[in-house]
Amino acid sequence: MPTSVHFSSAIVLGAGSWGTALAALLAERGLSVQFWGRDEELMRDIQSHRRNERYLPSLILQEGVEATHRIEKLRPADLVLFVVPSKGIRTVAQQLSAAQVLKGSELLVSCTKGIELETGERMTEVIGDCLPDHGLAALSGPNHAEEIAQKQPAAAVVACADSSHARLVQDCFTLPWFRCYTTDDVIGVEWAGALKNVYAISAGIARGMKLGDNAIAALVTRALAEMARFGTSMGGRAETFSGLSGVGDLVTTCYSEHSRNNRVGKLLGQGMPLAEIVSSTRMIAEGVPNTESLYRCARKAGVRTPLLDEVYAILYEDKPAKLAMRDLLSRDPRPEAD
């Protein structure tokens, strides 16, 4: 384990469960952390009680974590993590730019898995639009905040075109129970992270329909093939989809009860309408808006995505899950590698 941390300070934008876990990880590594969320009551409570009772009550935050709801009061830091829902990334980046908090030397890291609906841009592209002339990276992998809070062993990958920047982020997230790898395939990592959300919904739908292990294994395996086909067509490298941000994250989200996307899918498979699921769920399941974004991108790129198409039809065209499963199985036979 490295004996020194090259970055000494960080800003974490987003006070959900994952943002809370990441703030704790950085503080554990010795960084001073400014932790921002837009909800004044929540952030005041976190600052007073060192705990995010709403989203991750099991985790006690270190004294080195300073919570605030005022983005204009943030101070410059070495590292800035964006951990807000994908639909809010641009707004938060614009607010940060307008507040003139940053010096220009900060490394900006997207920890959000998604594609912007209006533009089809990856999260680092959205951040770069609003905050140009900064280093950009993406952190991804099979990480549930609940397990990170318990210091259970986990691993992630940081993607950055600049290998020296990637190593700096890697160092910040190197702990006895957390291992971070590096890659320069930012495109592949971000597409993998967005796509797996959709396929986690499909696995949840299968569970909600009480389908067996055979069906779920088939779905997950074909989802990986579809992820790689789609992601490489967008410029990612094939091997990335066999790594932590690809198959690693896919397996975790498709099989874990911690997965919000899986839980949404399960309720859909049981027949609950999407509107009811959304209104009754406090946490954001990124796979729901991501499905629409990715469906548009797939049609524009001319990529064959049968699983994505059926999840889209269930979510946005009210297609019954049983009919979607029938249509998947009744497609023309193909070679497995196709």
Each PLM stretch: what is its role?
Residues 110, 135-140, 180-184, 242-243, ...:
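General beta-strand structural signal in soluble alpha/beta enzymes
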Residues 196, 203-207, 232-242, 246, ...:
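NAD(P)-dependent Rossmann-like dehydrogenase/reductase catalytic/cofactor-binding core
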Residues 100, 126-134, 153-201, 205-240:
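Internal alpha-helical scaffold of NAD(P)-dependent oxidoreductase catalytic cores
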Residues 61, 67-153, 169:
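Rossmann-like NAD(P)(H) cofactor-binding subdomain of soluble oxidoreductases
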Residues 1-59, 68-69:
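NAD(P)+-binding Rossmann beta1-loop-alpha1 motif at the extreme N-terminus of oxidoreductases
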